[in-house]
UniProtKB/Swiss-Prot annotation:
Listed Gene3D superfamilies: 1.10.10.200, 3.30.70.980
Protein name as annotated: Probable transcriptional regulatory protein CAB166
Principal cellular location given in the protein's record: cytoplasm
Taxonomy, superkingdom: Bacteria
Biological process, per Gene Ontology: regulation of DNA-templated transcription
Gene Ontology molecular function: DNA binding
Cell compartments where the protein resides: Cytoplasm
GO CC terms in record: cytosol
The keyword Metal-binding belongs to this UniProt entry's keyword annotation: no
Family affiliation: Belongs to the TACO1 family.
PANTHER family: TRANSCRIPTIONAL REGULATORY PROTEIN YEBC-RELATED, TRANSLATIONAL ACTIVATOR OF CYTOCHROME C OXIDASE 1
Keywords annotated in UniProt: Cytoplasm, DNA-binding, Transcription, Transcription regulation
Amino acid sequence: MAGHSKWANTKYRKERADHKRGKIFSRTIKELMAAVKMGGPDPKTNARLRMIIQKAKDQNIPNENIERNLKKATSADQKNFENVTYELYGHGGVGIIVEAMTDNKNRTASDMRIAVNKRGGSLVEPGSVLYNFVRKGACYVPKSSIDEAVLLPHVIDVGAEDLDNDDDEHFLVLCDPVELASVKEKLTALGVACSEEKLIYVPLRLVDCDEQDGEANLALIEWLEKIDDVDEVYHNMA
């Protein structure tokens, strides 16, 4: 799974989890602004905006932050955000996928080049890494809210494909992307709390690394994750 590896020690994983919480906040705000650009600032007539506002509230983003960014999104000089994906090979043949949401693709591309210049690896052509991954829907269920033995029968009942427990804080209920909304709704009806649901990349095969390559890949991944525009980094390192 993304970001979980035998080379990642407890301190690294805790720092990464703390950093990702900030990334989730930032991503939701960018999605909100993009939704306003696409469909207007009124959630009554903009269904996507209405959904993202609810998502922001579920993530405990303060109402004043939501309102401030709604106003900012209507500004004439506010640029449009777009999703971009980069593919890299890290050390020891490990594949890395980077998802970003940016209002300046040139800036983001420059940040990616700086990352590989500083931490190694190489940017590659589209499709060079993606073929080693599959797109899945994922419902994030806090481990503090339910035992795995209790959750597993529910995963089967709602028609999900798998339950992944590699993440330190969440169980990931995996499903076909087109079934994500349905699976989330069914889990909620069963009393299972989903803190987030989204599409992710899951590796089809894992690559074993020696210790030197493993540590070098973690350094590269950490650098990539700290790029402002980057939302998610996936890899297939064992």
